[in-house]
């Protein structure tokens, strides 16, 4: 167990691993019992089920050996210090088509899919290392390699709350982006979300403050940034994911048929009480928004999904030549 001052090192660390038998808390069960009258075990107070879902700990390991292996893997993506650049592996995979993306992403824009499948298809084989998989699950944060080059990926997860940016997801992304920027890892944003999570519970939790901090983290990041919109990006959800051109990113891409806007057309027509003709016009505008955005230079290119990996590699090459 870790308690008190020792436990504070976990939320202040760049990466933390916890084994299945461990626990972490502000104060242990005896003190909790004496001060609050709450009778609780150390597992119930700060075991893996609590610490991982609260975001205090990043990853879970079976035992000490597994924990050390995860730490070595995490460090393998980083340079030896913050004053160096990450090492690019020699003899790594080069350009290739990723035709499987066409099968992974459903034609129905309201149907969920696993963004992990997209990431694994695009990245070098076996190179993906997911960080904080049990916290803020509507966003995926992971390290990976593209043609041997370490990158940091932030991706919406449509399987969880449609990929909405929640308070927990924003907190996770903020810390992850700051670490990536500190160690010069290019940031890849894979966007497919209906926006920042709305609703009374989300507002009470301070979603605007947390999403705003996520935006500031990615806006202040000085590493190369490449954004790909896969299906949709609405409202502040697109800005937080680095889509807007004033953000200074290296490359801004989108798949055919993507939808952009302040909100989905369905929400816009309901909010304004639009008549049927206006509703139809809003739907048509939504379907063509990707090409209109591309023509106004906010999107650099509408790409064939099977070219995603190759376009990411091209963006990294552009960045390295600057």
Describe the role of every protein-language-model region:
Residues 1-322:
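Ligand-binding clefts of soluble mixed alpha/beta catalytic domains
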């Amino acid at each position: 167990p870790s308690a008190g001052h020792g436990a504070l090192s976990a939320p202040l660390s760049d990466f933390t691993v916890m084994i299945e038998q461990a626990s972490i808390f502000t104060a242990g069960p005896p003190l909790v019992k004496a001060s609050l009258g709450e009778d609780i075990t150390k597992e119930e107070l700060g075991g893996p089920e609590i610490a991982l879902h609260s975001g205090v700990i990043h990853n879970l390991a079976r035992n000490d050996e597994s924990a050390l292996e995860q730490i070595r893997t995490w460090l393998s993506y980083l340079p030896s210090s913050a004053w160096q650049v990450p090492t690019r592996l020699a003899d790594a995979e080069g350009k290739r088509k990723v035709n499987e993306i066409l099968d992974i992403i459903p034609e129905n824009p309201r149907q969920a899919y696993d963004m992990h499948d997209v990431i694994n298809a695009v990245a070098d084989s076996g190179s993906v290392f997911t960080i904080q998989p049990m916290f803020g699950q509507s966003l995926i944060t992971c390290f990976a390699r593209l043609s041997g080059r370490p990158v940091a990926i932030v991706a919406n997860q449509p399987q969880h709350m449609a990929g909405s940016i929640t308070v927990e997801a924003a907190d996770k992304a903020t810390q992850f982006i700051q670490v990536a920027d500190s160690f010069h890892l290019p940031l890849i944003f894979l966007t497919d979300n209906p926006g920042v999570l709305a609703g009374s519970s989300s507002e009470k939790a301070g979603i605007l403050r947390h999403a705003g901090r996520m935006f500031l983290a990615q806006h202040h990041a000085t590493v190369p940034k490449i954004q790909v919109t896969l299906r949709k990006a609405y409202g502040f959800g697109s800005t937080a994911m680095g889509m807007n051109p004033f953000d200074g990113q290296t490359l801004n891409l989108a798949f055919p048929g993507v939808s952009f806007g302040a909100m989905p057309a369905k929400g816009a027509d309901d909010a304004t009480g639009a008549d049927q003709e206006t509703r139809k016009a809003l739907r048509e505008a939504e379907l063509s928004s990707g090409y209109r955005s591309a023509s106004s230079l906010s999107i650099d290119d509408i790409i064939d999904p099977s070219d995603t990996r190759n376009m990411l590699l091209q963006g990294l090459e552009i960045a390295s030549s600057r």
